[in-house]
């Protein structure tokens, strides 16, 4: 049912956005995967990567950390088909940093509170989106001192 899906999706986004000490809400969109399971595996590998999350917290457009997380997902990809966008800004195309890449432009985008990462695997038609938050020093302080 679409209504139930909408409510559950809204709740999932709120849970991700509500992380104590977080400063950014992140959508990781994996598109054009060979199958749903590969799309999901890559999306969660990126969304759960401490290196990706800390780079985003530091407003560092470190696309290499995203590529690392894709590789760590252990799914078959074709590097020459890989594309990565930060919001509407294309950073990687055909597995290579685009020639017109301007780090200043991407770093400016990273200052926002909502970050959309899109990873196009270019080998199918299945998509998956994962939601997460950044990993800040404040998050670590809160959770390091937390005791139940």
Regions found by a protein language model. Name each.
Residues 32, 41-44, 48-148:
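Internal helix-turn-beta structural module
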């Amino acid at each position: 049912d679409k209504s139930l899906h909408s409510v559950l999706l809204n709740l999932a986004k709120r849970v991700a956005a509500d992380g104590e000490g977080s400063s950014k809400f992140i959508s990781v969109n994996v598109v054009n995967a060979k199958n749903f399971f590969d799309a999901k595996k890559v999306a969660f590998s990126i969304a759960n990567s401490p290196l990706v999350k800390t780079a985003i917290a530091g407003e560092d457009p470190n696309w290499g950390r995203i590529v690392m997380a894709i590789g760590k997902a252990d799914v078959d990809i074709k590097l020459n088909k890989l594309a990565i966008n930060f919001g509407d800004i294309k950073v990687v195309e055909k597995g290579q940093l685009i020639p017109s890449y301007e780090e200043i432009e991407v770093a400016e985008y990273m200052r926002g509170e909502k970050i959309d990462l899109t990873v196009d695997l270019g080998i199918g038609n299945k998509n998956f989106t994962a939601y997460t938050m950044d990993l800040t020093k404040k998050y670590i302080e809160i959770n390091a001192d937390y005791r139940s």
